[in-house]
UniProtKB/Swiss-Prot annotation:
This is Large ribosomal subunit protein uL3. InterPro entries: Ribosomal_uL3 (IPR000597), Ribosomal_uL3_bac/org-type (IPR019927), Ribosomal_uL3_CS (IPR019926), Transl_B-barrel_sf (IPR009000). Belongs to the universal ribosomal protein uL3 family. It comes from the Bacteria. One of the primary rRNA binding proteins, it binds directly near the 3'-end of the 23S rRNA, where it nucleates assembly of the 50S subunit. PANTHER family: 50S RIBOSOMAL PROTEIN L3 (PTHR11229), LARGE RIBOSOMAL SUBUNIT PROTEIN UL3C (PTHR11229:SF16). Keywords: Ribonucleoprotein, Ribosomal protein, RNA-binding, rRNA-binding. One of its GO terms (biological process) is translation. GO terms for molecular function: rRNA binding; structural constituent of ribosome.
Length: 205
């Protein structure tokens, strides 16, 4: 499985050869530096650790600076491991957006936008308790009953209630690559991906 670390630029739309308007997301994908090579002999599994987006050295620990120095690179803001990388890579190698091709499908993982504390209507899509008139008072967006009284005399685990919404790790699978702009390290994928603008995402194929 190959992949890159990227940054969400934003959404736009393009026209295909049939004149159909397709919504798409632009991602700044790489270039990423190989900061560590995991091997079965030393680590018990095989993986590549990639670093993305330069970081100011004064915001890094000495241990982190020493780790990146071994790879011959500056400190990075985002570091991710990719297991079973498709191609053989060495420490310090640069991997760019050219590993992707137009027309293939990728998975994109990111942290969804945080919405704060939300009620059950927005968070879970509840319909409320019915009509807004005929004696109904202040219950339109209420969750309703969460369980019986004498038995089971408790609330079941997983009961959908109000709470903090968003800020979760979300993966969107099988997004088609519409365009690869190698000279600008841009990847254009069909549809939307999780996260706000300039948030980090992981692109896998």
């Amino acid at each position: 499985m190959s992949g890159l670390i990227g940054k969400k630029i934003g959404m736009t739309s393009i026209f295909d050869e049939n004149g159909k308007n397709i919504p798409c997301t632009v991602i700044e994908a790489g270039p990423c530096v190989v900061t560590q090579v995991r091997t079965n002999e030393v680590d018990g599994y095989e993986a590549l650790q990639l670093g993305f987006d330069d970081k100011n050295e004064k915001h890094s620990t000495k241990a982190a600076l020493g780790h990146f120095k071994k790879a011959g690179t500056v400190a990075k803001k985002k570091v991710v491991e990719f297991q079973d990388f498709a191609t053989e890579q060495k420490l310090g190698d640069l991997i760019d957006v050219s590993i992707f091709e137009e027309g293939e499908f990728v998975d994109v993982q990111g942290v969804s936008k945080g919405k704060g504390f939300q009620g059950v209507v927005k968070r879970h899509g509840f319909g409320g308790v019915g009509q807004a008139t005929h004696g109904q008072h202040n219950r339109l967006r209420a969750p309703g009953s969460v369980g019986a009284s004498s038995y089971p005399s408790r609330v079941f685990k997983g009961m959908r209630m109000a709470g903090r919404m968003g800020g979760d790790n979300v993966k969107v699978q099988n997004l088609r690559v519409l365009k690869v702009v190698a000279e600008k390290n841009l990847l254009v994928v069909k549809g939307c991906i999780p996260g706000h603008k300039n948030s980090y995402v992981i692109i896998q194929k």
